[in-house]
UniProtKB/Swiss-Prot annotation:
Its job: DNA-dependent RNA polymerase catalyzes the transcription of DNA into RNA using the four ribonucleoside triphosphates as substrates.
UniProt name for this protein: Putative DNA-directed RNA polymerase subunit alpha-like 1
Class of enzymatic activity (EC top level): transferase
One record GO biological process: DNA-templated transcription
Intracellular or extracellular location(s): Plastid, Chloroplast
Composition-biased stretches (Basic and acidic residues): 551-574
Amino acid sequence: MTNNKNFADWDSLECKDLHNDLLYGRFALSPLTAKESRLLKKGLREALLTGILCLRFTHAKIQNACKNLNLMNIVGIQESLDEILKNFGKIILTGKLEEFVGKGPFVAILDVRGPLNAMAVDIELPPGIKVEIETQHIATITEPIPFVVELRIELVSSTSKGETGITDEEGFSIDPNPPIQKVNSSIQGYEYGGQTFQTLFIEILSTSPTVPNKALLLVSMKIMNLFQIVLQAKYLDYKELEKGIHVGVFCVSALRAEQSKWIKTILEDALYMVGGRKHQGPLTDEEDDSIDSNFTPVQNLDCRIESYEEEGQTFQRLFLEIWTKSPTEPQEALWEASAKILELFSLFLQTSKENEKDLKQIIKDWTENKRKHQEVLRLLDSEESGSIGWITKMKLAYMHMTLLSMNAMYILLVHRLKPDYDRYNSITDQIVQELRASLNKLREIQKGEYSEQRILVHSIAQEIEAALQKYETTYKLDDFVIKAKKDMITMIWDKERADLESSLIRWESDEDYLNLKKMNPVEMDRSFAELQYQETLRKEQDEQSSQQQKDQMEKRRWERQNRERERKRGNREF
């Protein structure tokens, strides 16, 4: 395996929807050295499990009394307390997560009266937070009693664990459904051109709406933003010891707990990948003879964390003590290690291959669907369909022809998305090249006065920050535009197509339809017409039921808003 870019690349091997809103993704990264594989394996796992955040209910204080402490049942409610808490844990909350980082917990209130099926739509939520599925079930209230719950909302990651059982009068903990369920990785070695390389395989199991490939991009952006700050760490102390050992102490401030852990996890591996710095001018014979191919410039890394409070929030200072051996200075090792980390995680900014694969897969699926309908039409037009009634044949032909046209139009519309993808890929590829050019400048900094080096590093760090900000802005805008266009295409075609295809599937598997094949053409047409009539009635009932549900949701929203208004006026208390 190789590429023509002289750096690693990533590929999406498999992405699929599983049951219970779970999403699965499998990815490969190659070519990598053994040390690069180790760094990415540890860093990605840590960042995915702690860096992908979501809003979840974490605690419930229920006013209703339990009638049986052993069974944990609540008077007048069908579900057990354990089931109710699990239902709260499954509710997906949405909002602009960056607005909630470092804030909270927040309070939501469920205040309803039975008999009623309490749903997510009934919960009074703080501004900026919504439930993704309003119809999600919470509890069945079987008697005319109030059901009142005070809920705590927190920003959690996959390592956040709720306590189990009762916490006396304070209420009950809810085990939140994490955004990243599992991260597995494996490494496979191979030989190419007389050299040994490795491929790192990453498997991610996530909870909707967290998409595995976007989770990879998100944590990579977070790590890169973090290490462009590490580049500018405050230099606190420096001393020279015997045998050419240099010790430098640095401090990175205003970190969250998970960021401190990322730096410790990733930086140690990167520091031991650092090579000797470039000399200004040619090496002397004596210097050249003294170079050891196994020489390791970084001798040791010690980390210390100090927590502090600022404006009601808890932050950390991370102190880094780096030991190096001449001629490498501690600050040079830190810069080179940070550059290596930025280079490795920048590979996930290359999304052109993934976007192209996404388009090709959509077109492939719909082209296959189109082919199936063409085949059915061919059979209906052949002598093999002579035993089918004329009306039946015409109706089936019409349905397949309609679906064929829909598939063809959908493929055409998806093809029209390609210029949007191409424009996005062109812009992001250019940004990635700018970023890598800045990293090359960082590696090329020659030995000299620390103050001069520091000015250069600060300038390069600003370039890196600007490139990352430009990428993030472009990604958010274009991702929104492309997603909106894809959703519009889906909205236009999917419902009618799905209705027609589900009708065909039902008919072709229905016992009455199978019996049609045993009838003569006239009887077949009569029976087929009856099946069509029943299908029409079913659709009307489904539409009526759907409209009733919409009306019910609208009514429940109005009732919830009315309760909120009354509570704000002081007419209702929790």
